Amino acid sequence: MELFEYYKKRGKLKCLIGTGLFLYGLIGMYNTWGNINWGPVILIIIASLVFFCIGFWQLRKGNLLEKNIVKNDLTFLDIDTYVLLELPSNNKHLGLYTPDGRYVAGTKMISSTLPILKNKKVFGLEASDGEILAYFQSEVENYDWAIYDSNYNCVGMFKENMIQGFGMVRGSLMNEKEIKISEIEVEFDFFETSFHTMDDRILINCKRGYMPLEWSERFGLNVPIIKLGNNISNTEKIFGLGILLYILETIKVRKSRIFND
């Protein structure tokens, strides 16, 4: 999903919500005519206007991005810096974008479309041209997460520790031979985190809460910025990204449980 499509979809959704709230307010006024409680009605109308304004801004931003889109032939493995966005789509979950706003790849649920993966929770990293670059599968034997290349060869796993600290994810990075690479500990509200190889090279680095001014014109202020390590192989790039995606999704799920309890 290109960035302009992302903003257009979100803008349309906001406008629909604003329309729904406005109609709800009008219906409430009609049903209580002569004895209207203006407080809630005014709040509903204000909320609808806020959604309308945000939606209109996002639609306008999408149109501007579409006019100024820059295309090139770079592939996922040619790029080392990405911005990660949650996609407003049923099947696709996360999108990787270059700092100039070009969509490069995204995760999607694929186990439901392949009979061999029936009853398994498998995600694919799909390039913008539709090619599957990697597979990610949850709960594989004794591991919480396994990462595979495009030929479905295992490149590494992640196993969470039995004892988890409050507000963090702890676990071990394992290679395809089930040899421990390193231990990681990521807080739910981290500002910056990195994963390393056995020889202490950086696999991947992720920052939140910081956005260069030029990039902020295209993205939000608190979205993750991902930088792949230097001097690492393509397999290691897939592995590092797979682990990071698991950590971010786990943090999201566990934070929602905390707020819902």
Give the location of each predicted region.
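Low-complexity or membrane-interfacial segments used for flexible interactions
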Residues: 1-119, 166-170, 175-261
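Acidic, aromatic-enriched beta-alpha/helix-loop junctions
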Residues: 116-132
